[in-house]
Every structure is written in C-alpha cells, then in structure tokens.
C-alpha cells in the first residue's frame, strides 16, 4: 500500500527544528515511511529506523508527535513519569519505542533533541 506523504503546517514547523538535529548525526538519511518523515541510520537496506514524526490528526488521538526508539525500561520510566507528554506509540511501542507529544503548549526542544540523539545511539549500538 502506498501511503500519501503527510504535510501539515504544524508538522512542517516541527520538522524545521527536528530535521537539522537528526541529519547532523553520523550517516543519517531521511525518507518518508508510511507517509511520515522518518530518519534512518544509513542509506539503503542497512539503514534502520530510529525516529519518525507524525501528525495524527486523521487517526489515533490527533497528536503531533515524535516516535523514537529506546530501551524498554526507558520507555516505561518516561511514560509512567510523564503520561501527559509521553505515550507508547502504536505499531512500534511493543519494541520499546516512545511517543513524545509535540503539540502541547510548552515543548522542551532540548529534550526532543536529546531523545533523537539517544534513539540514534540506541539503534546504532544494537
């Protein structure tokens, strides 16, 4: 199934902040996956997904969010410690990924950048 590429004003605004951070990491490439901007550890079949950004207006709870790879214990700590900001995302949550809301009135962009960097390190080191 071909998924249409999602582009909304709020997604585009978030990508202005997220894209430079992710693409500055070693070997990272961006390409759409299931219609959403997605970051991979490398080009081609060896590239593994470590983060993606979703505007869920059409599905789930209407969130604008970052999904990022992390160890299961980190997922559990973040979700239990900040359920208003963090959640277990569909499809990938069972593998330890976290969802971080980007549509709240106050977003800590330094934290977002750190989560992206940690996700990259986690996937590369596996």
What function would you assign to each model-found segment?
Residues 1-126:
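Charge-dense, helix-prone N-terminal extensions
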